[in-house]
Structure formats: structure tokens, C-alpha cells
Amino acid sequence: MTDHPRVSNSGSNLSTNPPEILLPNEADSLKAQARENSYRDFMMIYFTLMTGLRNTEVIKLTIFCISPYGEISNDVEVPALIAKGSRSRSIPLHPDLKKELHSFLIWKAGEGEPLESDSPLFCSKRTKKPLSPRDFQRIVQLHSTNSINRSVHPHVLRHTFATRLLAKSNLSIVQQMLGHKSIQTTQIYLHPTRDDFTKAIENM
């Protein structure tokens, strides 16, 4: 997913209060900075950008969620136990993310991290236990500050995923991928820009 996401035109009244997102170059800079300093941090950021999971869902994922039978699955399973509202869902994994997850599991083995099915996918380097939501927040804030000169919350990664996905699909698909109970919640991503309006007129 490399298309330019829909962002608001700050000088226009066509869009009001859209979710904060990362532009493609910002997402690339964030990933590059994280990868240079911590493979685990990079994987958490990359995984969230490619799946749109919530902060609390990412940190509670286990190995089983992405590799239930010894190989990387085609989907990440978000079980009811960790999903908001106890609504389980399955999200397809992009081929590039699948390859990176395969490398990540090899890296984890080399680092002596547990790889049992119930082991955390992302864990503390020191304790090998699951990270907290605050830990993930600090990770994203650190790397975003150092790469794009502004501190962003993990939810911005989720917003970025949703906005880019909507540009390639429809609101119903985005609703299902994000795990929203109501499609009204998903409608916050319907913020067309002036360019969107211009293209719509040109395509009439």
C-alpha cells in the first residue's frame, strides 16, 4: 500500500478534524529510524501500519496469532480475549509483512526469546514478558520524534492504515478490519480533499 493517503487541506472547509495520519514519506522515515535502532521496535511499528491493530491488541498478540501451525499464517488472528469489545477478527497479512515476520521469528530465536505458541510476539528485551501500552507508546513517540520531528501516538499508525485502506477499498471493509462495532465510528475517515473533489468532477 503505497498510494498517497487522503489528508485534509488545512486551508479548506472541505474537511474538518480528520484523524492525524502519517504521510508516506513520514511513515518511511519512521520505519527506517526504528529499524536502524531496534528490530523489535521496527516490527511493532511496521506491523501496526500494515494491520491497523489497536495499541492494546498489538502488545497482547502471541506467536499463535500469526503462526498457529509452525509457519507464518496468511492472516493475523485477533482473539476475543484481546480484542476491544471481545469481538474477534481476522486480518490478512500483506506478503511483505509475512516475509518480515518470518525473519523476525528467526531473530527472536537468536535473541533467546520464547517461541511457544502462547509466548508474546513482542516482548521486553530484559524480562521477555509482554510490553505494556505505555511501553509501546514510548517506543512510537521516541522514534517519531527522532525521525519526523514530532511525537505521535500508536493510534496514528492505526489511522494511517485505515486511511490508506479506504483509498483502495470501501468503508465496510475498513470497519471490519478495524473491528468497529458501528460503521458510524469508521466514518471519521471520510474526509475527502479538494483534490478528491476535482478528480470526481473530471471523471464524470
Language-model-detected regions and their locations in the chain:
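C-terminal catalytic core of tyrosine-transesterase DNA break-rejoin enzymes
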Residues: 50, 158-180
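Alpha-helix N-cap/helix-start motif at helix boundaries, enriched for small hydrophobics
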Residues: 44, 56-61, 174
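Short, charged hinge/linker segments at domain and secondary-structure junctions
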Residues: 1-11, 73-75, 115-119
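Long, amphipathic, Lys/Arg-enriched alpha-helical "connector/arm" segment
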Residues: 2-39, 96
